Each structure stands twice: as C-alpha cells, then as structure tokens.
Amino acid sequence: MRKYRVAGLVAALLVLHSLATPSAQAEAHRAGGEGEEKMSSDGGPVLGGVEPVGNENDLHLVDLARFAVTEHNKKANSLLEFEKLVSVKQQVVAGTLYYFTIEVKEGDAKKLYEAKVWEKPWMDFKELQEFKPVDASANA
C-alpha cells in the first residue's frame, strides 16, 4: 500500500509542476511585445518566442528574403527589387516563422518592408504570410 501512496504523491507533484510551469512561461510571454525577445522566469528564452537571428548575411536567410519579395511581386503585380536583408528574427512553430526587414528598390527609391515567411524545410514548404511597408512614422 505504501508503494501506491508514494506513487500517487509523485504523480500529484508532477501534475502540479506541469500546471505551474506553463503559467510562468505564459507570464513571461505576455510581458514582452511582439517581435521582442521574451525571457522566462529562469532567464532563458520562452519556447515559441520571437528571437533575433543576427546573421543577415546567411545565404539561406537572404534567399528566403528574396523569395518574399518575389512572392509579393506575383501577388501584387509589383516590380520591387530586392536590395538587402536588413534584419531577421525567428519564431519556432510547426517549422519556423521568419520576420524580415528588407530593403527594396521601387523605381529609383529605396524603401523598407517587413515580411513574414513560414518555412518547413523537411516538407520543402515555404509561404509568404505577410508583406507590408515599414511605417515611417514608427521610425521617427
């Protein structure tokens, strides 16, 4: 009987621990804004949080940013030209969501756009989720 009582207590403690841990992560997630790095109560990054990548020269990331511009041009019947990848953040989901800030050329003018690309490399899948100009008033 004692063995079952100990097993029951251990199971109860595991349930309580699993209930307490997600709420600490959810609190840390709510504390940060979209696009900011979020930290859990133990100081580590929140799982599923948006994190800076910091390697704008990575060929794979540049290719994904070019893909975003090409897909936008197809959907919007536009003629934007990719210039450079300015910054990139990532979020691990069912695959990876990349948040790009991209410099493009529209005629003679250079402009900044934000793009969100969802990639699942094991399925050879990538999809442009969002493509919009950077709000100039937000940078002022």
Swiss-Prot record:
Keyword set, alphabetical order: Plant defense, Protease inhibitor, Secreted, Signal, Thiol protease inhibitor
Listed name of the protein: Cysteine proteinase inhibitor 1
UniProt subcellular location: Secreted
Signal peptide: 1-26
Native source species: Oryza sativa subsp. japonica
Biotechnology: Introduction by genetic manipulation and expression in potato or banana confers resistance to insects and nematodes.
One GO cellular component term noted in the UniProt record for this chain: extracellular region
Any one biological process term the GO annotation gives: defense response
InterPro entries named among the record's database cross-references: Cystatin, Cystatin_dom, Cystatin_sf, Prot_inh_cystat_CS
